[in-house]
Amino acid sequence: MAKEKFERSKPHVNVGTIGHVDHGKTTLTAAISHVLTKTYGGEAKDFAQIDNAPEERERGITINTSHIEYDTPTRHYAHVDCPGHADYVKNMITGAAQMDGAILVVASTDGPMPQTREHILLSRQVGVPFIIVFMNKCDMVDDEELLELVEMEVRELLSEYDFPGDDLPVIQGSALKALEGEPEWEAKILELAEALDSYIPEPERAIDGAFILPIEDVFSISGRGTVVTGRVERGIVKVGDEVEIVGIKDTTKTTCTGVEMFRKLLDEGRAGENCGVLLRGTKRDEVERGQVLAQPGSITPHTQFESEVYVLSKEEGGRHTPFFKGYRPQFYFRTTDVTGTIELPEGVEMVMPGDNIKMVVTLICPIAMDEGLRFAIREGGRTVGAGVVAKIIA
């Protein structure tokens, strides 16, 4: 069967469902698919198709995730749903499914539960920028006051983790009833879709961001100077642009005097392209793999940060034994490994394979980083963990 042409005309937004086990995340995902395809066309996915999430591997970590797509009149959405709590943790930490916004599902029969809190905390740590709340199973609650109470509780919980709890949209509905085709509950799903459209801003495309290129290789070309190669992560670099070399050593400034791709000279290199950038007056030994080339002032080097980390289980090829404070692995950022030490939260003596944990990392040399940067934890080239920079300390 021929693949359908990907519709490029509408803005593309990535979302996902989060929340406590059995609160109805997958049912809601199916309901959104059902109601939006019924209203705006497309192909609906049913509960069983979504629930039977295929296994994926991201950086050697096994994650079960379901991907579905749906449209509103103005946007195209890619939506991820995970069957198990561990899958959410891994998904959010590895950034396997980057979310521009999340739909937090809370059963109004239960109110916020332990995983509700944990998913909100994870969203904060990994930088999910926007959360919309869907209060599910409202058909099972007769008492208006009880619904108000649950809504208040959820809003307070979100505020506790620095989300705008008082202002974000909360929709009260029933995923199951909408899936069964009851008009009053289907209307709530359309209300949720409108909230997605209006509350989650259009994500910035990679090409519109500040230029950054993680350096993979350095060559010296006689008579021309030094060329660094790598894939442009975001932004555009043009011939004549001033750039900074950031990380590992002191930051230096230079000028891009040429861009080449597949041995051809270009005027610019754009996000997603593998290219070589010729640097004016830079010596071969002044720049190395692991540094980044960036728009001046857009990124700074750091050595200490708070992170959220998932430790691979033995089955995923991770460690077979726990680690303790004083653990000194390598932290792999973009293109290079840097040794670092860890500080565990108070009261935590050891970390078991398969755990997720908040830890403070101190690197032996600075790396160009922003909050939200992903990294791997390695021992002798073998990945034993995945993490994300939650907060820069120094």
Swiss-Prot record:
Protein's job: GTP hydrolase that promotes the GTP-dependent binding of aminoacyl-tRNA to the A-site of ribosomes during protein biosynthesis.
Localization annotation: Cytoplasm
Name of this protein: Elongation factor Tu 1
Family per similarity comment: Belongs to the TRAFAC class translation factor GTPase superfamily. Classic translation factor GTPase family. EF-Tu/EF-1A subfamily.
Database matches in InterPro entries: EF-Tu_GTP-bd, EF-Tu_GTPase, EFTu-like_2, EFTU_2, G_TR_CS, P-loop_NTPase, Small_GTP-bd, T_Tr_GTP-bd_dom
Assembly, per entry: Monomer.
Disulfide-bonded cysteines: none
Binding site for GTP: 19-26, 81-85, 136-139
Gene3D superfamilies: P-loop containing nucleotide triphosphate hydrolases (3.40.50.300), Translation factors (2.40.30.10)
Chain spans, region G5: 174-176
Catalytic activity as recorded in UniProt: GTP + H2O = GDP + phosphate + H(+)
Enzyme Commission number: 3.6.5.3
GO MF annotation terms: GTP binding; GTPase activity; guanosine tetraphosphate binding; translation elongation factor activity
HAMAP family: EF_Tu_B
tr-type G domain ranges (all copies): 10-204
Enzyme class: hydrolase
Annotated stretches, region: G2: 60-64
Region (G1): 19-26
Sites where the protein binds Mg(2+): T26
PANTHER family per record: ELONGATION FACTOR TU, MITOCHONDRIAL, ELONGATION FACTOR TU-RELATED
Region feature G4, mapped onto this chain: 136-139
